Amino acid sequence: MTWETLQSLKVAAMKACTCLNPLDTAMGMFGCLLGYETIWEQMKDDHIPDLLVGISRESRRVDEDPGVIVPDEFLHEIMTVRYPNPNMPDTSQRIATDTSQKLGIRYGVTLKRYYNSTVPMHRVSRLKFIPLAIAGWLRYLMGVDDNGNAMQLSPDPLMDSLQKRLEGITFGCTDFGEYALESILSD
């Protein structure tokens, strides 16, 4: 394998697992829940930009530096140029499509790195933002926005199966069986 090929694979992995795709997924879920139609509108929210930076920071702690581009500079460009650009018509609904198929690469790789790390500060129990993003997806699966109104869910090949496992859990419910969540997250 050539040096160029290796570096391009590292850059692709950084985008897929750290500085771009995990942020897109979080924006898709929370955008739908909070009623944002487009990605650029979400960047005006008081909390979403902080969530995105937090996810990226948690991911980068255990990610390999690609060496070709600087992850912090790449993230800065995404946060200040790409996401707030009203000429990029990306929608929350489009990004939320097929999320069940994306979670493994977008968050699972990072979670495995935390589990396998021998560095004390790299403990899964220290994570805040990645678990919040995953919780946002579980909340999204309920098909109820943050105002308690039914919302249209984006296509996902596992949607029926996932929603069936969440039966009995309702909006605002705080007492639910862990089995439902464990069965979804272990897939």
Predicted features, each with a name:
Residues M1-D187:
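Non-transmembrane, aqueous-exposed alpha-helical and coiled segments at domain scale
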